[in-house]
Amino acid sequence: MDIKLISKKKNIEERKQLLSELHASKSVIVEKDEELVCPMCDSKNIIKDYEKAEIVCEDCGCVLQDNLFDVGPEWRAFDHEQRVKRSRVGAPMTYTIHDKGLSTVIDWRNKDSYGKDISADKRAQLYRLRKWQRRIRVSDASERNLAFALSELDRIASKLGLPRNVRENAAVLYRGAVEKGLIRGRSIEGVAAAALYAACRRCKVPRTLDEIAEMSRVDRKEIGRTYRFISRELKIRLAPTSPIDYVPRFASELKLPGEVESKAISILQKAGDKGLTSGRGPTGVAAAAIYIASVLHGTRKTQREVADVAGVTEVTIRNRYKELTEHLDIDVTL
């Protein structure tokens, strides 16, 4: 199938004519600067609908392509067990394992390829082979340190319930620090915790330094110092954490309805426009906005409950509450 590129057109009629010609030839792929762009409204909100085999603009509804190929497997699976059994490839490459997941391991089950039990003498041989394989997977001290650091990263991330993309990001940052020799003179646990904190901020999955310090074996001050150092050396550009980023998590832990969450975000957006969030701890401002929104909605939570979830004091919530209600003219009846 020929692929034609549609450049940006000033005349809307010219665009329509070109689009109709391409639809007739069944070769519509709209692209600009390596990104899919709608030729009708210049939107980049393009949806690939594999069920209908279409590429559609989310904003104006223009169908850019109606014969999209499905590049997935030819087999179907209805549960995880079937998916594992029918898959003909191994696990994807990952930065969270020291060898990037490219090595293989001897299965712990003492069964052959037909599912039959292995004899006792073969079982002893397999035990020795497994032991030696574990040893040779880590060839030198640097690999051993990397394996330990990545396991520490995974341990902290598991305790904090962080998603896969944050773990991958943290592993990439830690590997970058190793390549630049930033680990020398610093604890492996400290650099791992700092990389995880940076990854959380980069992926918009906010966690405070206190939360990470609580789950790691390093104190808050060392994590903060190491984070600033590796951010400077690796040239990581991170915007300040917004209080809005904390609202979904706090609201979920408090079991508040979606209306309260939306109202809290609206309050914080207005507060940001008036400069009320700058220079203040994002968790405290987010907690105060959630408290105000819960009172306005009628699903009231106590200041103590909100403070415990946000990890701040009741005094902080009261101070931020007073600032928000006064400057935003919010009438709250307690």
Curated annotation (Swiss-Prot):
Question: Which residues of the sequence carry a binding annotation for Zn(2+)?
Answer: C38, C41, C57, C60
Residues in sequence repeats: 151-234, 245-326
ZnF endpoints (TFIIB-type):
34-65
Q: Name one GO biological process term.
A: transcription preinitiation complex assembly
Q: Name one GO cellular component term.
A: transcription preinitiation complex
Is Methyltransferase a UniProt keyword of this protein? no
Known HAMAP family for this protein? TF2B_arch
Database matches in PANTHER family: TRANSCRIPTION INITIATION FACTOR IIB, TRANSCRIPTION INITIATION FACTOR IIB-RELATED
Which NCBIfam families does the UniProt entry name for this protein?
PRK00423.1
**Biological role:** Stabilizes TBP binding to an archaeal box-A promoter. Also responsible for recruiting RNA polymerase II to the pre-initiation complex (DNA-TBP-TFIIB).
Name of the protein in its database record: Transcription initiation factor IIB
